[in-house]
Amino acid sequence: MAKNNVVKAQGTDLYFIDPDTHVVMNAGCITSLSGIDTSIDQIETTCLNETARSYVAGLATPGTATFSINTNPQDPVHIRLLELKNAGVSLDWAVGWSDGTSAPTAVLDSSGEYDFDVPADRSWLLFEGYMNSFSFEFAQNAVVTSSIGIQVSGEPVLIPKSTS
């Protein structure tokens, strides 16, 4: 039986807000994206008279997201990503799912910060984080690629596509 209730990865876009210009930039030809996650720490609540440990949920610990690109030193977005990684600045990120094609915009919020304004005709995963690695890979019979790590800060927010 064919499954029609899946979302394909092909057609996914990764965006970030440039902190200097407040322009939304598309990371371009990403080839993979993973690890946008938080794990829940455990707090032990075991009493000495118990024979098995017991726990309650603690704080969420954000993980490290990773995305890969076919690196091009002539692509101004790739150069800007490397500059921002080297500066260690935290960025707002938006993953646009393949169930739509609209791009987000940046809007000034009431506290004077720029945030994403995401169209309702596409699903979104929003998160904050700084790039903590930007490696270059050179291999035989291949294009130059980069694997870029993002230390996620806070809880990612999933915004489903509007059904209306």
Swiss-Prot record:
ATP-binding as UniProt keyword: no
Alphabetical list of InterPro entries matching this protein: Phage_TTP_11
Protein name: Structural protein 3
Domain of life the protein comes from: Viruses
The keyword Transmembrane appears for this protein: no
GO CC terms: virion component
Protein source organism: Pseudomonas phage PAJU2
Compartment(s): Virion
